[in-house]
Each structure stands twice: as C-alpha cells, then as structure tokens.
C-alpha cells in the first residue's frame, strides 16, 4: 500500500512538471527561441501590434526578469546569512510584475483572468507598461531607459532615482546590450517567422 502511495505521489509530481512550460533551450538566440516556442512568438507579435514595443525589447525584459521561468520569484532574504525569511517583493512570473501593478494592468486592459505565470499575459503586460514610456517620448528601441522606468516606475525615472543604484544601471546596460543582440538576430529571421504564423 505504501509503495502504491509513493508511486502515485511521483506520478502527480511528473504531471505537474509536464504542465509547466520549460525555458527555451537557447535563451541567447531570439530566432531559436521563437522557432522552439511558436506560441511565444505569436504572443509577442500580438503585444507589439497592440502596444508598439518591438519583440527584441520585450524579450530582453523577460530574459532579465525571469530567465524565461514561469514560476520565477525573488530569492528569499536571509537572517544571519542562512535562515530563510520573506521575499523582498510580490514579484512573480515571466514579467516579475508586482501584485499591485498587475492588478492595475488587469483593470486598465480588461484582461481580468490574466496570470503572471502565463507567457502571453506577461508579454501583453510588458508591452502595456513599456508603452507608457513610448507615449511619453521614449524611443521604443531604447531598452535601457524603458527598463529603468520598468524597475523604478515612471515617476521614479523622472526623479532619476536610478542614479543612486549603480547595480541597476549596470543591469539596464545589460538589457540594452541583449536587446541589441536580439534585434540583429531577429532581423535575420523575421521574414521566416512571420511566414510561420500562417501555419500556427
């Protein structure tokens, strides 16, 4: 009987794992990501049409925020250097959206059933948030500034709160570098990817 219960428990774990979307095998190559995850490409293009944020900018955000992991959360803080404590924020999922900001997104867009662990919803969220900068005069390819505003909020960005956070500036520089890399890759496969949408 115990053996049966153990086998049943393992089966449940395997089922749960199989339902979780795995990160792409080649996270450094945008073309390979989209060829592997066709539904992701479709979601990103849909977000671009709605919010005007390019795929390579959006995907550079996802890479930085969650490494393409659906259930990503901030590491727990530790007491005395080793005792697990609370997480520093309510961020969850591909976009690492905070609970309050996610609720604002759902209210404003009407996407009331949106989940932070769903890639399409997360792609739409990032486009929604970044578009606020685009309509305020940010260049839509300026991943660095858009990311700083994504992290600090647009009010914080205007106040230049990021200037006191050298670590954040370095992260934003990495996001820009990845966006530029993704952009060059995307230009080489965009035509084929768009043709593939016909068969999805």
Regions found by a protein language model. Give the residues of each.
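Conserved small/polar residues in nucleotide/adenosyl-binding loops
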Residues: 198-200
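Catalytic glycan-binding domains that act on GlcNAc-containing polysaccharides
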Residues: 20-194
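C-terminal motif of bacterial Sec signal peptides marking the signal peptidase cleavage site
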Residues: 16-18
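Sec-dependent N-terminal signal peptides
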Residues: 6-14
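Positively charged n-region of N-terminal signal peptides that target proteins for export
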Residues: 1-5
């Amino acid at each position: 009987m115990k053996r049966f219960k153990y086998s049943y428990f393992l089966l449940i774990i395997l089922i749960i794992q199989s339902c979780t979307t795995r990160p792409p095998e080649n996270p450094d190559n945008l073309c390979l990501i989209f060829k592997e995850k066709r539904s992701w490409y479709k979601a990103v293009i849909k977000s671009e049409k709605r919010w005007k944020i390019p795929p390579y900018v959006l995907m550079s955000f996802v890479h930085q925020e969650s490494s393409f992991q659906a259930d990503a959360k901030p590491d727990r803080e530790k007491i005395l250097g080793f005792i697990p404590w609370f997480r520093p924020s309510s961020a969850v999922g591909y976009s690492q959206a905070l609970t309050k900001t996610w609720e604002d997104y759902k209210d404003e867009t009407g996407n009331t059933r949106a989940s932070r662990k769903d890639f399409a919803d997360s792609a739409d969220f990032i486009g929604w948030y970044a578009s606020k900068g685009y309509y305020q005069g940010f260049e839509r390819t300026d991943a660095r500034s858009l990311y700083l505003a994504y992290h600090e909020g647009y009010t914080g960005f205007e106040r230049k709160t990021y200037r006191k956070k050298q670590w954040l500036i370095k992260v934003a520089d990495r996001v820009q570098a990845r966006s530029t890399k993704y952009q060059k890759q995307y230009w080489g496969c965009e035509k084929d990817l768009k043709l593939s949408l016909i068969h999805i």
